[in-house]
Amino acid sequence: MRTLDFPYLIIPEMMADTLDRYVEKLGNPVPVRKMVVEAGEATFVGDTHGALDVSSYALAVSRNSALVCFVGDLVDRGKNQLYNLLFIVESAIISRRVVIVRGNHESTLTNDYYGFSDELKNLNVFDHLYPHVVRLYGRLPYALLLNNCILAVHGGIASDPSSLHAWDSLPMDDPEPSNPGAFQILWNDPREYVDGFLPGTRGEGTYLFGPDAFNEFTEKNGINFLIRAHEVKKSGYEYMFQGKLVSIFSSRYHKGKAAILKMTFGTDSRQEIMVVPDEEDSIEWPANPV
């Protein structure tokens, strides 16, 4: 497998400046970012976990997309966590069409256990850079609402709050996050066999939600499709709840496939799952990825 070169030197000040510029661009943080794509494409990328080649591929094949949304988990687990984070952040700085939604690994709770803190320490940048990373975590939106009816979140719906209007009041600048509702949005998982909400398998404060809870949420909030990431899928994706929910996973650390979702709006509305090629040698670094 080919490793992509990355145009950064290990200079903490440069890296911190990149993160700070994106925080400045985000401005006043909002829990739910709202966008409209009336015609054209929107692309959604699931967990990349340091898969810089997948992130590069996603942007390279999405040059015609009006929106490219990375649905969280840019760091931890993989080989190029810091560079993957910086590449996506730099792309979001350059182009407003690139959006980052927060995942459960954009958190101080996970980085010490799943590799990101160790990577920063091995690069001798942890003390200088990590405070800037944490500040960024707290400014990322928990969800993206597209065209008022398509919701992208990392984990899933929360047992409480159950309305998007209430989601708009979730506290920001919360590095864990400690708010139970925000925590659930990042950590919860869907299951076909569950009635309502049941305690999850990922630890205290996490839940599984079933089709009845999902349908109640979507009907209450006018949502007709939910895009989420968070769970390893051998094929890179899985549809659930009669096709109204899709899980997208965009990393190969689990030895499975990596996939991205393209949606087209307008007279020819459709969805397309794109499986990322297994051989990185088939991927060229985009000269102008955004």
Which functions belong to the PLM regions below?
Residues 1-290:
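Feature recognizes metal-dependent phosphohydrolase scaffolds
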